[in-house]
Regions:
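Active-site acidic-Proline motif in GNAT/NAT acetyltransferases
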Residues: 81-83, 87, 115-116
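Conserved acetyl-CoA pyrophosphate-binding loop and the N-cap/start of the following alpha-helix
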Residues: 84, 88-96
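A short helix-loop-beta-strand connector motif used in the catalytic cores of GNAT acetyltransferases and
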Residues: 37-48, 74
Length: 147
C-alpha cells in the first residue's frame, strides 16, 4: 500500500468531495490508512486498485461484516476517476464485488451513499440495489443488493 499511498488518499478524498462537497468528513489521513491496512490484512482481495492502459483509474474496498445478526458483503468504496465513469468500468467493479461476495458465501451486500450523489444512486439502482433507509442523521442512505 505504501507504493500507492498518494493515489488511495487522492481517490478517497475525491469520493468525499463528490458525496459531501468537502473531504473534512474523512478525518485524519493516517487513521484512514491504518484502517485500510487492517482491512487489507483480513480481506486482501477486497482491496483493489483499478488500472486501465497503465494508469490507476479506480479503487474498490470490500469486506464481510455482520448486520442485523447475519453476515453481509459490504462495499466501503466504489470509486472511478471522473473521466472513466459511465462507460462500463462501474459494471466491472460490480462484477468483481459479486465474485468476492460469492467466494465468501454471502448473498446480500450493502453500501452507504450520500443522498446528493444522484449519479451513484442511479448506478446502484441500475445494478439492482434498493434503498434500505437513511442513516447517520440522514447524511447517508443504506442500500442493499442480492447475488
Amino acid at each position: 500500500m505504501e507504493k500507492h499511498r498518494e493515489v488511495v488518499i487522492k481517490f478517497r478524498k475525491d469520493s468525499f468531495m463528490i458525496s459531501f462537497g468537502d473531504s473534512s468528513g474523512l478525518g485524519e489521513i493516517e487513521d484512514y490508512l491504518s484502517w485500510l491496512k487492517d482491512k487489507i490484512a483480513v480481506f486482501p482481495e477486497g482491496f483493489v486498485l483499478v488500472e486501465d492502459d497503465g494508469a490507476l483509474i479506480g479503487q474498490l474496498e470490500l469486506s464481510i461484516r455482520e448486520y442485523e445478526g447475519k453476515d453481509i458483503g459490504y462495499i466501503n468504496l466504489y470509486y472511478l476517476v471522473p473521466e472513466k465513469r459511465g462507460n462500463g468500468h462501474g459494471q466491472e467493479l460490480h462484477n468483481y464485488a459479486n465474485h468476492f461476495f460469492k467466494k465468501h458465501h454471502v448473498h446480500e451486500f450493502h453500501l452507504r451513499v450520500s443522498p446528493t450523489n444522484t449519479s451513484a444512486i442511479r448506478f446502484y439502482r441500475k445494478i439492482g440495489m434498493e434503498e434500505v433507509g437513511p442513516e447517520v442523521d440522514g447524511k447517508v442512505i443504506r442500500m442493499k443488493g442480492y447475488l
